UniProtKB/Swiss-Prot annotation:
Mg(2+) binds at residues 72, 140. Residues 291-542 form the Glutamine amidotransferase type-1 domain. This is CTP synthase. Allosterically activated by GTP, when glutamine is the substrate; GTP has no effect on the reaction when ammonia is the substrate. The allosteric effector GTP functions by stabilizing the protein conformation that binds the tetrahedral intermediate(s) formed during glutamine hydrolysis. Inhibited by the product CTP, via allosteric rather than competitive inhibition. It comes from Yersinia enterocolitica serotype O:8 / biotype 1B (strain NCTC 13174 / 8081).
């Protein structure tokens, strides 16, 4: 099988939407029956985004095989059926660390290590490895053309045309075409200069995607084609839209997929976008709306919760409801109390690390429990729900997590190495013991309890969901909590770790240790989010009555 490569770069400014554009094009090519995947190459020096601040970088997207990756991989999985893996994302930091490790081992036989060829060769090897077995691989280069950090990546993709053949490579450049109100027209000069910058590196773009707040007129597209040496039919206008799921249709309507298939000499049927048309129909024809409060600590940057926000919208699609998401700082809940939570149809507490704002989340979980408001807790959201229930229902005063209070009397959440039984004996771990409690990352099996609400929603006894956490429910204190009325609705494959809890005497109170948002898609949704949004709609109806 010959793999074809589409390299996606951005110019003029950052945040133009390269990831969405690449994912949308991939969706069209997939709809034509092609086997497609997408890669993201990040120029920053961090080895991966796992330890980066969510308020700077946005969320960390976790793949099925346990890689901590860029949030763009979430967009990729929401647009195409191919599951991302650790092969689909790498950084400058990872490339340099691998090259330096080889140098220390003597693999280069004493050669002087340089950006060209050693770093660029390592990048190319990764790209080829990630594209194995696919008809088309789209490779998004992070950052903007002209950034110092991205130069090795741009040089590597320039060399790819030589290595695999120009007939199997295509360069797609996203650029800004701003509209100047004073002049009453769009301006093409920034695009011309961006392409000039790309040409200076040795890359002639084959396709230009022109981002603007309005459709770029045909005469301006012709001008861009002339000055940038690109066929007019390969200059694509991509205007701002109210739904990202309209973009596949926009690109297809301008013949981008036909142009690419001809360029690669691919024979395949026309794209059938019926599934995307159904998504748009559901989105534009809601039967009502609900307001869901998300209580978090990184709310100043919504991208920190990108997958959760999208999953809530998907839940709305499955229920024909518009979901209005109210982002609430958990510290504000601590200081201002329940007034921050009034008027909500449901409450969601997502994952997070660190003590800041935790007591606000505990208060929100209590408010949802006591007022019969639908509640969904994810990761830390499950842990604070457990802490709240232990304190206020199970009689465990000041119950906490050892992440926040290491010497608390009732550590209902702890590392496995900190679990103590009634006699004070520490849980013993061996090399064969479960790895939970260090950092569980990636897809894990979960057995659902017969008769539970979540078993009913999933419709199957065993599921696989993705984790990213260190702390677990403390089994040593679980009996007392269960006796007070809490149900364990899901356990790990070996039945040792609590994965899901729910309250049988509450209309809809579910919390999970895993991250269901990472497997939600607009076409399929996710059982937990669909059930949660449905419960929000039912709560709203009860309040009206």
């Amino acid at each position: 099988m010959t793999t074809n490569y589409i390299f996606v770069t951005g110019g003029v400014v950052s945040s133009l939407g390269k990831g969405i554009a690449a994912a949308s094009l991939a969706a069209i090519l997939e709809a034509r029956g092609l086997n497609v995947t997408i890669m993201k190459l990040d120029p920053y020096i961090n080895v991966d985004p796992g330890t980066m601040s969510p308020t700077q970088h946005g969320e960390v997207f976790v793949t099925e095989d346990g890689a901590e990756t860029d949030l763009d991989l979430g967009h990729y999985e929401r647009f195409i059926r191919t599951k991302m893996t650790r092969r689909n994302n790498f950084t400058t930091g990872r490339i340099y660390s691998e090259v330096l490790r080889k140098e220390r081992r003597g693999d280069y036989l004493g050669a002087t290590i340089q950006v060209i060829p050693h770093i660029t060769n390592a990048i190319k090897e990764r790209i080829i490895e990630g594209g194995e077995g696919h008809d088309v691989v789209l490779v998004e280069i992070g950052g903007t053309v002209g950034d110092i950090e991205s130069l090795p990546f741009l040089e590597a993709i320039r060399q790819m045309a030589v290595d695999v053949g120009r007939e199997h490579t295509l360069y797609m450049h996203l650029t800004l075409v701003p509209y100047l109100a004073a002049a009453g027209e769009v301006k093409t000069k920034p695009t011309q200069h961006s392409v000039k910058e790309l040409l200076s590196i040795g890359i002639q773009p084959d396709v230009l995607i022109c981002r603007s707040d309005r459709a770029v007129p045909a005469n301006e597209r012709a001008k861009i084609a002339l000055f940038c040496n690109v066929p007019e039919k390969a200059v694509i206008s991509l205007k701002d839209v109210d739904s990202i799921y309209k973009i596949p249709g926009l690109l297809k309507s301008q013949g981008l997929d036909d142009y690419i298939c001809k360029r690669f000499s691919l024979t395949c049927p026309e794209a059938n976008l019926a599934e995307w048309e159904q998504v748009l129909y559901e989105e534009s024809n809601p039967g009502g709306e609900v307001t869901i409060g998300m209580i978090g600590k990184y709310v100043e940057l919504p991208d920190a919760y990108k997958s959760v926000i999208e999953a809530l919208k998907h839940g709305g699609l499955k229920n024909r409801l518009t979901v209005n998401i109210k982002l609430i700082d958990s510290q504000d809940v601590e200081t201002r109390g329940e007034e921050m939570l009034k008027g909500l149809d449901a409450i969601l507490i997502p994952g997070g690390f660190g003590y800041r704002g935790v007591e606000g989340k505990v208060l929100a979980a209590r408010y949802a429990r006591e007022h019969n408001i639908p509640y969904l807790g994810i990761c830390l959201g499950m842990q604070v729900a457990l802490m709240e229930f232990a304190r206020n229902v199970a009689g465990m005063e000041n119950a906490n997590s050892t992440e926040f209070v290491p010497d608390c009397k009732y550590p209902v959440v702890a590392l496995i190495t900190e679990w103590r039984d009634e006699d004070g004996n520490v849980e013993v771990r061996t090399e064969e013991s479960d790895l939970g409690g260090t950092m569980r990352v990636g897809g894990q099996q979960c057995h659902l309890t017969e008769g539970s609400l979540v078993r009913q929603m999933y419709g199957e006894p065993t599921i696989v969901e993705r984790h990213r956490h260190r702390y677990e429910v403390n089994n040593m204190l679980l009996k007392q909590i269960e006796a007070a009325g809490l149900r364990v609705a899901g356990r790990s494959a070996d039945n040792k770790l609590v994965e899901i809890i729910e309250l049988p005497n509450h209309p809809w109170f579910v919390a999970c240790q895993f991250h269901p948002e990472f497997t939600s898609t607009p076409r399929d949704g996710h059982p937990l989010f669909a059930g949660f949004v449905k419960a929000a709609g039912e709560y709203q109806k009860r309040q009206v009555k």
